[in-house]
Amino acid sequence: MSRTPLDTVEHATATPDVELPWAELGLKKDEYERVVEILGRRPTGAELAMYSVMWSEHCSYKSSKVHLRQFGEKAPQSDAMLVGIGENAGVVDVGQGYAVTFKVESHNHPSYVEPYQGAATGVGGIVRDIIAMGARPVAVVDPLRFGAADHPDTKRVLPGVVAGIGGYGNCLGLPNIGGEVVFDACYQGNPLVNAGAIGVMRHEDIHLAKASGAGNKVILYGARTGGDGIGGASILASETFDDAKPSKRPAVQVGDPFQEKLLIECTLEAFAEKLVVGIQDLGAAGLSCATSELASNGSGGMRVTLDDVPLRDSTLSPEEILMSESQERMCAVVEPEKVDRFLEICDKWDVIATVIGEVTDGDRLEIFWHGGKIVDVDPRTVAHDGPVYERPYARPDWQDALQADDANKLPRPGTSDELKAQVLKLVGSPNQASKQWITQQYDHFVQGNTVLAQPEDSGMIRVDEESGLGVAIATDGNGRYAKLDPYTGAQLALAEAYRNVATTGAKPLAVSDCLNFGSPEDPAVMWQFAEAVRGLADGCLQLGTPVTGGNVSLYNQTGEAAIHPTPVVAVLGVIDDVARRTPVAFQEDGQLLYLLGDTREEFGGSAWSQVIHDHLGGLPPKVDLERERLLGEILISASRDGMIDSAHDLSDGGLVQAVVESALLGGKGARLVVPDGLDAFTFLFSESAGRAVVAVPRSEEVRFNDMCGARGLPVTRIGVVDGDAVEVQGEFTLPLTDLREAHESTIPGLLA
């Protein structure tokens, strides 16, 4: 961009014919023409930089916005919802004056280019979203997807991602309490690195991203601004990959968790002293986003002097300063008489802080550099009035053939020995095997409030030490189900996360989501996206769990090959007393095992069809959300009233996977009996939704059965906790030692 003379607003007005590199910055021709129309002149280089990042797919949701509106239009009535979609993160009331904020986001593309930094800064960004709401971060979760487990590139990407998440989270002193690790060839070259965080605050501590009050000062504080991450939102997060790994590296941000830790403490102290009017973290699009968002959400305008921004690299141009995505930075709006105290607190925590501007009583965002005005825009046009596309979408030609290729017709084991061999193969397959080698690199118990963490059904954190009030969070997604039917697949992800919260004894309250899809320019991908959003919105309405916010990640494809549609759903729940939680592990010999829900012949998209036959086809399991709700109520009541000592949801891998996990975690075996009307194969491997297996003390058997009967939930006694093997009567016996070897050796063997 031209540096001589400075491309001021005055210069831009006088030189209408100057060609600007709008295409290189990711804008389409008609989008550039719209900018010219809004301004009534050509943009300056700095204005072009701002519009290009803020109108990118990543920041503006221009392809997804028309569909995402359903989350608001179909939102269920919820007394718990305090802050919804549109802020940095959603906030829900969890009782006793406490509020919890939570959100899931993606850092997919940066994590492929630079796995460690991409994943680390993903954690840093989501944690700053939580701080910006006024909350103290208390935990993180990380739903991850990688290519085939035995592919050489997985061995490059996965260890870096895991080290980045662990390194950053551990340095912040935040326990990692949940997430998933899934392998599938469709994620080759497009790993999904989704990160979530939870924060806790009192109701009166909620803060919003708005700049109001003419004369109030705008303070930039945190790390210095450097050249890392420039154009990250427009370059990395809004494009597909085509053999351009090294050249994309400068667009990956570099994280410093110790700086972030200071930023957290500094910000929370400023909040405690009521010094902050409005606040915004600097994430995607950096200062371009923070200034335009704060100004457009407030009641006035803003004037900013870029010369006052503390730089790590003095050669940066004003355009680069506006686009930089350097990490660990925040922007606060502070009343003039409180500025000195705010700066004192920053100094105490060794955090660099500078007044870079002020709120004005107009409606313009004006930015100056070396005395010249280089930006003069209506901030709403930058932050909120970007292009909105109704992209064409169509059910793909191949969908019918895929659904007709019925997994229920695949060859099944013909003998007990074959059945036994397939059980061992399933529990030792990469997706069903223990992920302990990965999760042990994270600290689960720092801060001392972790109640449950991986491999439990959901992570659980104590919020109040005296009362035992706690929250649980589960994240789930199944790209295989969604590929077969995106509407049902999204609802199955929601149902599983809802169920995973309920099995621990917590009541599901609200949802955040991370929607990972291929290119929106492909009508088939756009159809998958539209169907998944419709399914999720309908499902949340039916379950009474509003969507509080989330993230869309598009362009997850290499060349023509898109990832499976992968909606990842996080459900947050509340429990009155964490002492009443229910774990996955079997607790005592002699306890009775009950299967809740109906088991049908449903193998489409199943772990069995993938592991044994390398097959994907047919229809995913049917979803009945009213039944899920009923199951949830019964699990919560049984947990609260001491009727069950362990509970585990049934999902990938079916009943046998759930029983093996509970047995290995508790070090206690199980003797199972195939119920009447089912064959052993369907009993063990079906992935019918809406089911859980629970261990009931004999003293509670009558009370538990009476409750299930009164509420109309099918319940079947299937066995007993006993011994040191998993035995299916009349079929096979598998010692826990053999199961442990199969279950726990796979991931270290592939990755260590």
UniProtKB/Swiss-Prot annotation:
InterPro entries linked: PRibForGlyAmidine_synth_PurL, PurL_linker, PurM-like_C_dom, PurM-like_C_sf, PurM-like_N, PurM-like_N_sf
Keyword Nucleotide-binding tagged: yes
Catalytic activity: N(2)-formyl-N(1)-(5-phospho-beta-D-ribosyl)glycinamide + L-glutamine + ATP + H2O = 2-formamido-N(1)-(5-O-phospho-beta-D-ribosyl)acetamidine + L-glutamate + ADP + phosphate + H(+)
Binding site for Mg(2+) 1: 105, 551
Positions annotated to bind ATP: 61, 103, 513, 550
Lyase keyword on record: no
Known partners and oligomeric status: Monomer. Part of the FGAM synthase complex composed of 1 PurL, 1 PurQ and 2 PurS subunits.
Protein name, as recorded: Phosphoribosylformylglycinamidine synthase subunit PurL
Organism of derivation: Streptomyces coelicolor (strain ATCC BAA-471 / A3(2) / M145)
Originating gene: purL
